[in-house]
């Protein structure tokens, strides 16, 4: 936000791009009486921002990839990348409209026009990656505000090298590189027998949310597998 006036923007737009439209009256904001349970002001709005997601987060990323061979789940994993303090989960969405009869109560999917679609309407957010508070002088809607963003970093380098080791058949070296990333996050360490291309890409999802062009990476590895005739790719 220290940029000159003419060079400033509302910021990173991470809250806009990744957060759900929890505040929107047409679909997500209704209370049990059909009125507004959520509003775009006050508590929640100052931190969750004005989401309008271009990238909807799914339950696979929020829940499934945090399971491990030690029987941890997203609820009890020691992995800091899924620590409760770092995420904003579904049960933490609290109706913030003082005029609502459900003010202060948790979001209820049954209030939606289509309750079965709740998983795409209100979903967990890796808040530690997407939230940057507005500058005190910033008057634009909270959309992620101004902050630094990764271009590249060591964790991705380790995971790229781990993948290279995997293609060469050296799963021991691959596990060592993956464990450098997992150890930093306090996640349970793995062994060479755990290493396959699926695990490597799950680890990329756990570590590199918002940092990698994931579709491009999946396409890249699909071409490699097709070239090698692996797993039905041709």
What kind of feature is each model-predicted range?
Residues 1-48, 165, 170-186, 190-193, ...:
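Aromatic-residue-lined binding/catalytic grooves and analogous aromatic/hydrophobic interfacial grooves
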Residues 73, 141-143, 148, 191, ...:
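Residue-level signal for the start and early helices of compact helical domains
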């Amino acid at each position: 936000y220290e940029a000159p006036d003419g060079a400033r923007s509302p910021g990173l737009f991470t809250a806009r791009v990744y957060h759900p439209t929890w505040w929107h009256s047409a679909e997500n904001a209704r209370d049990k009486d059909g009125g507004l349970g959520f509003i775009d002001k006050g508590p929640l709005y100052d931190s969750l921002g004005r989401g309008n997601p271009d990238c909807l987060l799914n339950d696979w990323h929020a829940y499934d990839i945090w399971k491990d061979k030690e029987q941890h789940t997203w609820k009890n994993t020691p992995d800091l990348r899924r620590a409760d303090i770092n995420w904003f989960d579904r049960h933490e969405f609290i109706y913030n409209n003082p005029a609502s009869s459900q003010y202060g109560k948790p979001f209820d999917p049954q209030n939606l026009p289509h309750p079965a679609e709740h998983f795409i309407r209100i979903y967990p957010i890796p808040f530690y990656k997407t939230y940057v508070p507005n500058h005190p002088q910033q008057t634009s809607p909270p959309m992620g505000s101004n902050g630094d963003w990764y271009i590249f970093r060591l964790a991705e380098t380790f995971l790229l090298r781990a993948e290279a080791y995997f293609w060469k058949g050296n799963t021991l070296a691959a596990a060592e590189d993956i464990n450098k990333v997992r150890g930093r996050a306090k996640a349970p360490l793995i062994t060479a027998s755990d290493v396959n291309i699926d695990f490597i890409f799950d680890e990329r999802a756990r570590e590199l949310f918002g940092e990698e062009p994931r579709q491009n990476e999946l396409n890249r590895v699909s071409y490699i597998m097709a070239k090698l005739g692996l797993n039905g790719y041709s």
